[in-house]
Amino acid sequence: MIALGRSLPGGNAQNIRWIDSFAEDFPINGGPFDLTVAAASIHWMDHSRLFPHLLANAAPGHVMAVISGDYPFEPPWQSDWHSFLVKWVPAVTGQPFDHDKRSEGMRSYQKYLNLYGSEHFVSEHPFQQSVEDFVSCQHSRDTFAPSKLGDRIASFDAELAELLRFYADDNQLSFVVGTRIAWGEIKLI
């Protein structure tokens, strides 16, 4: 992500510091910062370490923004996807799949923020992706990482691909993408 960000217009601007580090342990050199942007992976982080560290290095008026969601928004395969998760999440994690609890966990960082606002966006135009690429992208998620699936990865891939092919046109899925942004200031805790 950092390489991509640097390659985009303005990515080498003097007022941008690119830091490659665990968020909880990033180096404190370079002075306070005005904006912190996090992605969906924030739910993997140790919030009790992360937010005090960010706050200690934030400039007055600092804003924290969290962008989450690259998910198909209400795709035609939603019901089948849910059934797939009900089967595979417990097989990998040992815990039952609970969509409401998962959603709550994905927002657990919010207790560390005084939220100014949040918005949900849905792409204007459908996104197209091959079935194979969609399946492959699932391995970027913690639950379905190759290290967690182990020797079950081929079965996972085959089952998900079979499910999705029913909804594909010439092996291409078409769906709109949902994204959410929330922003605020870090609380003194």
Spans of features found by a protein language model:
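Conserved catalytic/acceptor-binding region of the Class I
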Residues: 56-128
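Class I SAM-dependent methyltransferase SAM/SAH-binding core
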Residues: 1-27, 49
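A short beta-strand submotif of the Rossmann-like class I SAM-dependent methyltransferase core
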Residues: 35-39, 47
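Conserved Class I S-adenosyl-L-methionine
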Residues: 98, 102-189
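A short, conserved alpha-helix within the catalytic core of class I
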Residues: 44-57
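A short acidic, Gly/Pro-enriched loop at the edge of an enzyme's catalytic core
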Residues: 24-36
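Tryptophan-centric aromatic hotspots in well-structured domains and transmembrane helices
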Residues: 18, 26, 44-45, 68, ...
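Structured loop/turn residues at beta-strand edges in well-structured enzyme cores
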Residues: 14, 30-31, 175-177
